[in-house]
Amino acid sequence: MGINTVENAFITGLNGSGQIVAVGDSGLDGDHGDFTGRLSGVTSVTPGDPSSADLSDGHGTHVACTVLGSGFRSNGGYQGVAPEADLYFQAMEDDDSGALYSYGINSMLNSAYNAGARIHTNSWGSQSGFGGYSTQSEDADDRTSTWDQYWSYDGMTVLFAAGNERNDGVSPPGTAKNVITVGGHKNRYSGAPDEMYYWSGRGPTDDGRIKPDIVAPGDYVRSCKSQEATSAGGTWSNTWYMEYSGTSMATPAAAGSSALVREYLTEVIGRQAPQGSLVKALLILGAKDMGARDIPNDDEGWGRVDLVNSLIPDGEVGIFVDDRSRIRSGQVIEYTFDVNTAGKGFKAVLTWSDYPGSSSSSIQLRNDLDLELVSPDGTTYKGNVFTNGRSIQGGSKDSVNNVEVIALDSTAQGIWTIRVKDSQHGGSRTWQPFSIAVRGHNVNDLSPDPTFVPDSMNVSTPIPQVGEEVQVSVQIKNIGAGSVTDIPVMARVDSALLGEQLVSLSPGQTEELIWSWAPETEGDSAFEFFIDPNNQFDEMSDSNNYFGEIVIVSAPGVRVSALEDTLTLFDPTSTTSTWDLTLTNTALLE
């Protein structure tokens, strides 16, 4: 894959364009200036209070601006993570009391999804029941597990703050399985960025799951100041911006990062409607261990967000993703990777949006999938069996989490096999969709890979005659992980150009190309087809760009021949004569 091409696209092109991010929070100063032209909807979800104003402490305006503020009032100085994304805002603050209320998570997520938002971020949570799986956690898992059924829906990434109660635990609904739960790390001053924000809520959940999932900048974060707020304070402020700390600030940073990941998937490599679990997997894939190597842990989860590491890792390192597979009870799905250079790192992340658990149960995992990695010599590594931040052999399978990770510092040369197993299927749905993200040396990356479908060539007349116009077709399928636009496909017959066509293919798509042909000579005609004949496109493999086949051509009609080319009549009065003729069927057809 052309790393420079992707890097340029990432640096200059990713800004959240085309993404709608929903924010559920206190209220919004929609006239601030940093949201101009990008408000896809602003609504109140507070019972009895139709106002969407941000009148108390400006929390919602600050959060929304961290996701996608344009930086207009600061000449770009305090720009959000995804400054060209659109905002769908749901105001939750009761103006009289300043408390947050809503009609429920189901209602909030449904209205946001129906408005076109595919990312929903929430910098709020319960002030009790820390670590517990609440009815709100159930609701979040219900919506996300439904929408990640890719054959019917478009997927949604939902994020919740871990809360600021430190060792008391993670605030529900951040305890939901399928959401991305975000803790905070230091943003500025001593220890940043590799130390935790002191008050960030720690895991695990009551049923033992790893939370938070990731961490993002959580202290001294400068963002928009609501002009309507009566008690906007913070540790610094000017007319248009102020500084707040907390996992409320970290979560929108992760949401903005999610918007960039989703933009990359949909616009750069052409993967439409990615599962929310794939966005989660890619953020975890690139997450960096902070301080001593000890992931996963109850402070940072799988590490701090690093988008470059998620999407364009250094060197000859590729990324492979799949969010279009599903599994049912007892099944095993395998992926193989040919690692051609020893001594390089390898990381695989499996995520799935699990069927909702129950607030009355002590066990929340319903569909238990397992991740395994098998080395060329047969050594097996299990998901989430870690020591000192890296996977080790042995250990027991994880039957608690719906995120499983394997990470190695060094791999041997040869074929490595990833296995996804459905070891226990407890939900009511037959199929469990999942997402997998892999990073490693010579791993199939996010490039397209158009190739010819075996045995797909067809001639409208199986054995055409000379001069007969027929239709010649061949099928091409994109077996890669990225889309390709207007890649040329050339056809030749007996080394002469038959024609060239352009084809565009999304991942997994198949197209049939058709050429008209009228053979000029009988006998064997050699057909050759070439994808990208001038080698101008980045592909996972160039070795499958050629296809050839022989077509037999017959001469038309019946041929008449004789031993004597002419017959001479000597008796002009004779009324009859004899001439031996031979008739030959030259069409190879009866």
Predicted regions mapped to residue ranges:
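Short proline/glycine- and polar residue-rich coil/turn motifs
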Residues: 327, 395-400, 410, 502-511
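Hydrolase catalytic cores
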Residues: 64-67, 92-93, 169-172, 218-294
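Noncatalytic accessory or regulatory domains flanking protease catalytic cores in secreted, cell-surface
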Residues: 242, 296, 373-437
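Subtilisin-like serine protease catalytic core
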Residues: 8-101, 115-118, 127-132, 151-155, ...
